Amino acid sequence: MDSNTVSSFQVDCFLWHVRKRFADQELGDAPFLDRLRRDQKSLRGRGSTLGLDIETATRAGKQIVERILEEESDEALKMTIASVPASRYLTDMTLEEMSRDWFMLMPKQKVAGSLCIRMDQAIMDKNIILKANFSVIFDRLETLILLRAFTEEGAIVGEISPLPSLPGHTDEDVKNAIGVLIGGLEWNDNTVRVSETLQRFTWRSSNEDGRPPLPPKQKRKMARTIESEV
């Protein structure tokens, strides 16, 4: 196993522990708590994949961080912070919408890269909107936290979420996953639109009808994908 992979996991475990202590003092805002919960799932998945104990890794990560801080001068810290571009956290969904449990009458699941796509194939003839919480850097989607499909009545009928055991995805991965979800929902004559915020930072454009600018070739490919899996 690569030593950098292990040490990266150890540091991530310790930093999560620090953030958890911060949250326990009721100091974290909603985006902070949301990332904390999802990072916990990711760490559990990575720990299982790597065969490493999280508690042991946390202690090792603490030693690594303490060693770095001992060598770090205040001036170097200021320069590092100034040179790192800041990302923004954007929310289409409330914390309640993100944390709400939902159930599928006819569940369908597909894995696309490091993203998991879930939808309820029992949903027909509905108007559906896709809403997401994600981070943005350089005016482009950086990391998808969670995307969910809602009916006009507020029911959740679909979802795209990162796989805890496979961290890391690009905006192109998110575009493709959204296309698969749209194709699956439209197969049952549902009308799907994407939130303006998600359109703007994923495709850098927005349409009044809420349709992302998918090229015809990609639309046909996604339709065939859904048809072959139904």
Swiss-Prot record:
Annotated stretches, region: CPSF4-binding: 180-215
GO terms for cellular component: host cell cytoplasm; host cell nucleus
Location in or out of the cell: Host nucleus; Host cytoplasm
Keywords carried by this UniProt record: Eukaryotic host gene expression shutoff by virus, Host cytoplasm, Host gene expression shutoff by virus, Host mRNA suppression by virus, Host nucleus, Host-virus interaction, Inhibition of host innate immune response by virus, Inhibition of host interferon signaling pathway by virus, Inhibition of host PKR by virus, Inhibition of host pre-mRNA processing by virus, Inhibition of host RIG-I by virus, Inhibition of host RLR pathway by virus, Interferon antiviral system evasion, RNA-binding, Ubl conjugation, Viral immunoevasion
One GO BP: symbiont-mediated suppression of host mRNA processing
UniProt motif Nuclear export signal: location: 137-146
Region of interest (Disordered), residue spans: 204-230
Coiled coil: none
Xref: InterPro entries: NS1 (IPR004208), NS1A (IPR000256), NS1A_effect_dom-like_sf (IPR038064), uS15_NS1_RNA-bd_sf (IPR009068)
PTM notes: Upon interferon induction, ISGylated via host HERC5; this results in the impairment of NS1 interaction with RNA targets due to its inability to form homodimers and to interact with host EIF2AK2/PKR.
Residues covered by region (PABPN1-binding): 223-230
GO MF terms held by the record: protein serine/threonine kinase inhibitor activity; RNA binding
Transmembrane feature ranges: none
Record region (RNA-binding and homodimerization): 1-73
Annotated motif Nuclear localization signal, positions: 34-38
Pfam families, A to Z: Flu_NS1 (PF00600)
Subunit structure, interactors included: Homodimer. Interacts with host TRIM25 (via coiled coil); this interaction specifically inhibits TRIM25 multimerization and TRIM25-mediated RIGI CARD ubiquitination. Interacts with human EIF2AK2/PKR, CPSF4, IVNS1ABP and PABPN1.
Free-text comment on this protein's domains from its UniProt entry: The dsRNA-binding region is required for suppression of RNA silencing.
Family the UniProt entry places it in: Belongs to the influenza A viruses NS1 family.
Name under which the protein is recorded: Non-structural protein 1
Lineage, uppermost ranks: Viruses, Riboviria, Orthornavirae, Negarnaviricota, Polyploviricotina
Gene that encodes the chain: NS
